Amino acid sequence: MTAAQFTNVTVNAQATISYDGRCSSHTIMFEDGRHKTLGVILPCDNLVEHYHFSTNTSERIEITGGECEVKINGEEAFSYYRAGQSFVVEGNSGFNLRTEEIVQYICHLEG
């Protein structure tokens, strides 16, 4: 699991917001050129069955708070993840995520 805080980073103050504000994230940039995003996803409801996210590069999504179910493109079923667990999505792919509670995450851009 990743540390609860990062040092010596630059933070993009402009959030990436999707699904009418239900999902938001901020990008942090490290001195060595690495990027990560830190985000929050609000619970699904009768208006949103699940969220879909596309990837351009390989991403490791680390759940830091809450729990959710994820179905990566090409998989047949959803898999369960909770705080302390992570999953990998290849580049040029995507995944569906559904949750009944607030989920916090770190997206490690690995590609």
Curated annotation (Swiss-Prot):
The keyword Transferase applies. It comes from the Bacteria. It is an enzyme of class 2 (transferase). One of its GO terms (molecular function) is uridine phosphorylase activity. PANTHER family: PYRIMIDINE/PURINE NUCLEOSIDE PHOSPHORYLASE, PYRIMIDINE_PURINE NUCLEOSIDE PHOSPHORYLASE. HAMAP family: Nucleos_phosphorylase_PpnP. This is Pyrimidine/purine nucleoside phosphorylase 1. It comes from Psychrobacter arcticus (strain DSM 17307 / VKM B-2377 / 273-4). The lineage of its organism: Bacteria, Pseudomonadati, Pseudomonadota, Gammaproteobacteria, Moraxellales. The gene is ppnP1.
